[in-house]
Curated annotation (Swiss-Prot):
Post-translational modification: Ubiquitinated in the presence of host E1 ubiquitin-activating enzyme, E2 ubiquitin-conjugating enzyme and ubiquitin.
UniProt EC number: 2.3.2.26
Name of the featured protein: E3 ubiquitin-protein ligase SopA
Biological processes, Gene Ontology terms: protein ubiquitination
Task performed by this protein: Effector proteins function to alter host cell physiology and promote bacterial survival in host tissues. This protein is an E3 ubiquitin ligase that interferes with host's ubiquitination pathway.
Organism (species): Salmonella dublin (strain CT_02021853)
Keyword line: Secreted, Transferase, Ubl conjugation, Ubl conjugation pathway, Virulence
Active site: 753
Chain intervals for the UniProt region annotation (Disordered): 137-171
Gene Ontology MF: a single term: ubiquitin-protein transferase activity
Subcellular location: Secreted; Host cell
An annotated GO cellular component: extracellular region
InterPro entries xrefs: SopA-like_cat, SopA-like_catalytic_sf, SopA-like_central
Length: 782
């Protein structure tokens, strides 16, 4: 039996199937109890509808002309498709007589259609711009019918092969999406209809509640190839999801939470993308188009594909709004530049790195022209807003961090407007950070702020010497910052050469100490003394120090050395032995003062002095003991008879029989919060206190090379004796303990220099319990 191609009306096939069923029933009802029981390669539900039967199959092969409608690769599959009608009562010929030629034609067409619907994953999608015909069959450029299948690109979904009712609520849409996504995850190839969620309603849906956790994980499962065009995601939460090759055209994503959401290879044209302010991490767009899409001013567009803008009008939003073009994207601007708008739109340093400045700048360099144009439009808006200096002041740093860099420096309009802003920013930096350390520079600061400061010093060379504290910090961080570019380092080195040539600086560098010892810098090693800070009070005074020393003094740790520098007067090195570090920093180099004082407050040695020498009874002596801790060497000596007698009177009650009295020992434990501490912890503290009193008795503080106050030596030895009783294990050996004890008292011919004892004990403590030593020993003695 043959039928022509003209016999098939694709648009009426569903009705033809209904008529066919009626026809079969009419032809078989008078004693002919036959039913169709098997249709090869067709859906089970269709078999069930026609299921009957006994034997004597009659087969109808699909006509060759219908087969020829399809590509050659599909013929083998179609050849296998046979319609078998079993056990029609009466003879085969009688059965044939009851089925008309017209009905056979209808059966062929209907079953062919059903076969196609269930074999779609076996066909290649060959649509070349042709609109789909009803039922998923289309006509290609050569007018040959083709079949849509599961690999249909998301931007051109074909119509559903079977009419299905759309979900009626967001919950139903969510259930349908969950089912499709899980089938895709299981490896099933979805048809275009399966992935068609156009006009869907996902409002208020939290996707983490309907999808497995694997879809929210880093490098987890992906929602791939779905069509969400013209859908609603308002107030939904799509955080941490990855949409790949998806279509969102004309969709609404207002107030959607999309923290760390990834859109890749997707079509997001004509979308309202004003995501919720509760979005913590910005969404990312990788090889994604956003033509005429409205974007919030706090987006990262580093992977967006820009195209030429069309003549479309700005989008309409509730409450109105101003907009600027960024390529073919729309960026929202404030209606008025109020104080809140300035902070919200421009201050990324206050808003977790998010601002309209960073949004525009996030585009790749290949879009430089579009970036500059958008920034110029932004500057015009700011200029039109007539903002005061006070209003701009909080965002000066954010503005220069972006606009003072290429490609925006190429714009005369931007340069003219930014010039005064950058000058005010630089003046504020000089005022703020000349006498205090700069914040530890992170990547942002190294790449965006340090180059601006270099440029400002280059324009204002006098500031190099008038604000030597800030200038040296900037050079330090440029030379040591791991995220600084080679260009930044080269410019910093060149500027420092200009600084060294200044008449206020050059006298201090030709003394055989600076840099590589010949008056020039040596940036090959951080140990070279390359930095020279000028006194803030006396132009004849300077401090020379290395990169490592400058870094540690600006950001100290408990074991930082505060005397590892050269103090220069008229270019000559002078001793710091008689100089109090705190006074030196307060008067000449205040950039170190705050850090020094902060470390000093963590040293608790003074608490023991207050126990022994109360300010009420021994005010003058208390001040002498405290003042001595602020310098390496003291000019005050306590070896005269009156001083020795007074000290003996004070310390005798604390040392009955040469040992710590139980009451005084408990006072010490209480003062240092050691009452419940382990014996070893108590011993370590007493050992370090002994070290400090050994220093008091030495020639460096209250003693001389030939004499020292006996009461101080005896008290130091008593502290050490108690530490030995508590925990001998903290000592190097019993022999060393005995040696130190003999030196305190001059027994057995031991050399009685307590400076040697103090240094030896201090080295041991620094090696084995440094944190305890650092919490007690005065900074000037460390």
């Amino acid at each position: 039996m043959k039928i022509s191609s003209g016999a098939i009306n694709f648009s009426t096939i569903p009705n033809q199937v209904k008529k066919l069923i009626t026809s079969i029933r009419e032809h078989t009802k008078n004693g002919l109890a036959s039913k169709i029981t098997s249709v090869k390669n067709t859906h089970t539900s269709l078999n069930e509808k026609f299921k009957t039967g006994k034997d004597s199959p009659i087969e109808f092969a699909l006509p060759q002309k219908i087969k020829d409608f399809f590509q050659p690769k599909d013929k083998n599959t179609l050849n296998k498709t046979l319609i078998t009608v079993k056990n029609i009562k009466d003879t085969n010929n009688a059965g044939k007589k009851n089925i008309s030629a017209e009905d056979v034609s209808k059966m062929n067409a209907a079953f062919m259609r059903k076969h196609i619907a269930n074999q779609t994953c076996d066909y290649n999608y060959r649509m070349t711009g042709a609109a789909p015909l009803p039922g998923g069959v289309s006509v290609s450029a050569n007018n040959r019918p083709t079949v849509s299948e599961g690999r249909t690109p998301p931007v051109s979904p074909s119509l559903s092969l079977q009419a299905t009712s759309s979900p009626s609520s967001p919950a139903d849409w969510a259930k349908k999406l969950t089912d499709a996504v899980l089938r895709q995850k299981a490896g099933e190839t979805l048809t275009a209809a399966d992935r068609d969620f156009s006009n869907a309603d996902f409002r208020n849906i939290t996707f983490s509640k309907i999808l497995p956790p694997s879809f929210m994980e880093r490098d987890g499962d992906i929602i791939k190839g779905f069509n969400f065009s013209n859908s609603k995601f308002t107030y939904s939460d799509i955080s941490h999801l990855h949409f790949d090759e998806c279509r969102f055209t004309y969709s609404t994503l207002s107030d959607v939470v999309c923290s760390n959401t990834k859109f890749s290879n997707s079509d997001m044209n004509e979308v309202v993308l004003q995501y919720s302010i509760t979005t913590q991490q910005q969404p990312s767009f990788i090889d994604t188009t956003l033509k005429n899409t409205l974007i919030r001013h706090k987006a990262n567009l580093s992977g967006v594909i820009l195209n030429e803008p069309d003549n479309s009008s700005p989008p309409s939003v509730s409450g109105g709004g101003n907009f600027i073009r960024l390529g073919d994207i729309w960026l929202q601007m404030p209606l008025l530049w109020t104080e809140n708008a300035v902070d919200g739109f421009l201050n990324h340093e206050h808003n977790n790195g998010k601002s309209i400045l960073m949004t525009i700048d996030s585009l790749p360099d290949k879009y430089s022209q579009e970036k500059v144009q958008a920034m110029e439009d932004l500057v015009k808006s700011l200029r039109g807003g007539r903002l005061t200096e006070a209003c701009i002041r909080p965002v000066e740093s954010s503005l220069v961090s972006v606009l003072a860099h290429p490609p925006y420096t190429q714009s005369a309009l931007i340069r003219e407007w930014l010039g005064p802003v950058q000058e005010r920013f630089f003046a504020h930096q000089c005022q703020t950070y000349n006498d205090v350390p700069l914040p530890t520079p992170d990547t942002y600061y190294q790449q965006r702020i340090l180059p601006v400061l270099l440029d400002s010093f280059d324009r204002n060379s006098a500031a190099m010497t008038t604000h030597s504290g800030l200038f040296n910090q900037v050079i330090l961080h440029c030379m040591t910052g791991v995220d600084c570019t080679d260009g930044t380092r080269q410019k910093a080195a060149a500027l420092y050469e200009q600084y060294l040539a200044h008449p206020a600086v050059s006298p201090h560098i030709h003394n055989g100490l600076f840099g590589n010892y010949d008056g020039s810098s040596d940036w090959t090693t951080r140990a070279a003394d390359n930095f020279l800070l000028l006194s803030s009070q006396d132009s004849d005074t300077a401090m020379m120090l290395s990169t490592d020393t400058l870094l540690t003094m600006l950001n100290p740790t408990p074991d930082t050395a505060w005397d590892n520098f050269y103090l220069l007067r008229a270019g000559e090195n002078v001793s710091t032995a008689q100089i109090s570090p705190v006074e030196l920093f307060r008067h000449d180099f205040p950039v170190f003062l705050a850090a020094f004082n902060q470390q000093a407050t963590q040293r608790r040695f003074g608490e023991l002095i207050d126990i022994i020498l109360s300010t009420e009874e021994h005010g003058e002596l208390n001040q002498q003991f405290i003042a001595a801790t602020n310098q390496k060497h003291s000019t005050v000596k306590l070896i005269d008879d009156a001083s020795v007698s007074r000290l003996a009177t004070i310390f005798a009650p604390l040392l009955p029989e040469g040992k710590l009295s139980p009451a005084h020992y408990q006072h010490i434990l209480s003062a240092y919060h050691l009452t419940d501490a382990t014996p070893q912890k108590q011993a370590e503290t007493l050992f370090c206190l002994s070290t400090a009193f050994a220093r008091y008795s030495s020639s460096a503080i209250f003693g001389t090379e030939h004499d020292s106050p006996p009461a101080l030596r005896g008290y130091a030895e008593a502290l050490m004796q108690k530490a030995w009783e508590l925990s001998p294990a903290i000592f190097p050996s019993s022999e060393q303990f005995t040696d130190w004890s003999d030196r305190f008292h001059g027994l057995h011919g031991a050399f009685t220099c307590t400076s040697v004892v103090a240094d030896s004990m201090q080295r041991h403590a620094r090696k084995y319990f440094p944190s305890v030593l650092s919490s007690i020993l005065p900074l000037s003695w460390a």
